[in-house]
């Protein structure tokens, strides 16, 4: 069985084909980074228009890469939310239209479920149950996962997501868009301990997170200490240390509360090397295991959507004729399969 996956929830157009016996047969990805760079962030209208231009050519390229035509596809999965509603509608409309034209089932996929399941594409895949840390530009949450669709929200960011805080702080430091990865690179040149940022919400019980205050703290630190290259690197290091420490503390608590020994980390920020190293140390100390998707599946992509869609299609879960697009969609409202 093969599923075509379509991802257009923000500023990446991702198309992939997943085979339940052979794995990923094709993977096409187009990033809009250059399009949005001059604006310092994603412009929703421009994102939607670019998805219109790129989605169908990438579908054609994915089919060609896999050596398939429409008869070789058993279902079409598309991101139905959460995300930018205009961008979502592009992929959802194309996916639903192709499903109708090709007489195939269409599967509406939750974007964050796609991220959560991305490590399942690896040879070393996690077994249920596990705790998932989902960290991206739009979301930061801890979830207990007992099976596909069986999700319990343990905690989430009450303001900025971790990735959003990275990008906003990078912008304050004059780094180009998208600034998060550039800030991390700058932090590698920094000295630990010169500056100390708070670890938000770690001095109280609970698993919710907050990162917006770190951006303000960074702005004040920059204003008070100048912006020579080494100072900027030291501030970047202090900021990254604060975010990573906070996430690690919350993961430790979540694992303790649930009694689980497996941790899945997914989403764009999961590619951060400092975060990976610290969580590896954490899980070693707990005699547990940590799982990640490969780097190319950390950011938005069609492979995770194709995989998630396959699991729901196998369970007989697919959409009626209507196009589904949900800009706000709590992960823990999904039905288990």
Swiss-Prot record:
It is found in: Cytoplasm. It catalyses: L-threonylcarbamoyladenylate + adenosine(37) in tRNA = N(6)-L-threonylcarbamoyladenosine(37) in tRNA + AMP + H(+). Its cofactor is Fe(2+). It is an enzyme of class 2 (transferase). Substrate binds at residues 134-138, 167, 180, 272. Belongs to the KAE1 / TsaD family. PANTHER family: TRNA N6-ADENOSINE THREONYLCARBAMOYLTRANSFERASE, TRNA N6-ADENOSINE THREONYLCARBAMOYLTRANSFERASE, MITOCHONDRIAL. Signal peptide: none annotated. Binds 1 Fe(2+) ion per subunit. One of its GO terms (molecular function) is iron ion binding. This is tRNA N6-adenosine threonylcarbamoyltransferase. Keywords: Acyltransferase, Cytoplasm, Iron, Metal-binding, Transferase, tRNA processing. GO terms for biological process: tRNA threonylcarbamoyladenosine modification. One of its GO terms (cellular component) is cytoplasm. Its EC number is 2.3.1.234. It comes from Aeromonas salmonicida (strain A449). Fe cation binds at residues 111, 115, 300. InterPro entries: ATPase_NBD (IPR043129), Gcp-like_dom (IPR000905), KAE1/TsaD (IPR017861), Peptidase_M22_CS (IPR017860), TsaD (IPR022450). Pfam families: TsaD.
């Amino acid at each position: 069985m093969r599923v075509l996956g379509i991802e257009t929830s923000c500023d990446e157009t991702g198309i992939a084909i997943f085979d339940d016996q052979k794995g990923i047969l094709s993977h096409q990805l187009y990033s809009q980074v250059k399009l949005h760079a001059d604006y310092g962030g994603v412009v929703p209208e421009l994102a939607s228009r670019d998805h219109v231009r790129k989605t169908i050519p990438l579908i054609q390229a994915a089919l060609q890469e896999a050596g398939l035509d429409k008869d070789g596809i058993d279902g079409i999965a598309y991101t139905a939310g959460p995300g930018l509603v205009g961008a979502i509608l592009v992929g959802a409309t194309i996916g639903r239209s192709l499903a109708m034209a090709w007489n195939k089932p269409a599967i509406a996929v939750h974007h964050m479920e796609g991220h959560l399941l991305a490590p399942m594409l690896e040879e070393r895949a996690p077994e249920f149950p596990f705790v998932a840390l989902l960290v991206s530009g739009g979301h930061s949450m801890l979830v207990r996962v007992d099976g596909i669709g069986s999700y319990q929200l343990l905690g989430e960011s009450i303001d900025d997501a971790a990735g959003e805080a990275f990008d906003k702080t990078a912008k304050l430091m004059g780094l180009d868009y998208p600034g998060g990865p550039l800030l991390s690179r700058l932090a590698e040149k920094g000295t630990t301990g010169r500056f100390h940022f708070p670890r938000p919400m770690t001095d109280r019980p609970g698993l919710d997170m907050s990162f917006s205050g770190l951006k303000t703290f960074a702005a004040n630190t920059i204003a008070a200490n100048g912006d020579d290259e080494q100072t900027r690197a030291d501030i970047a290091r202090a900021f990254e240390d604060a975010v990573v420490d906070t996430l690690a503390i919350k993961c430790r608590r979540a694992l303790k509360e649930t009694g689980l020994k497996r941790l899945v980390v997914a989403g764009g920020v999961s590619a951060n090397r400092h975060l990976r190293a610290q969580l590896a140390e954490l899980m070693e100390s707990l005699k547990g295991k940590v799982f990640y998707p490969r780097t190319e599946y950390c950011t938005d992509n069609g492979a995770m959507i194709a995989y998630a869609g396959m699991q729901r299609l196998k369970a007989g879960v697919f959409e009626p004729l209507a196009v589904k697009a949900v800009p706000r969609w709590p992960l823990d409202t999904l039905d288990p399969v």
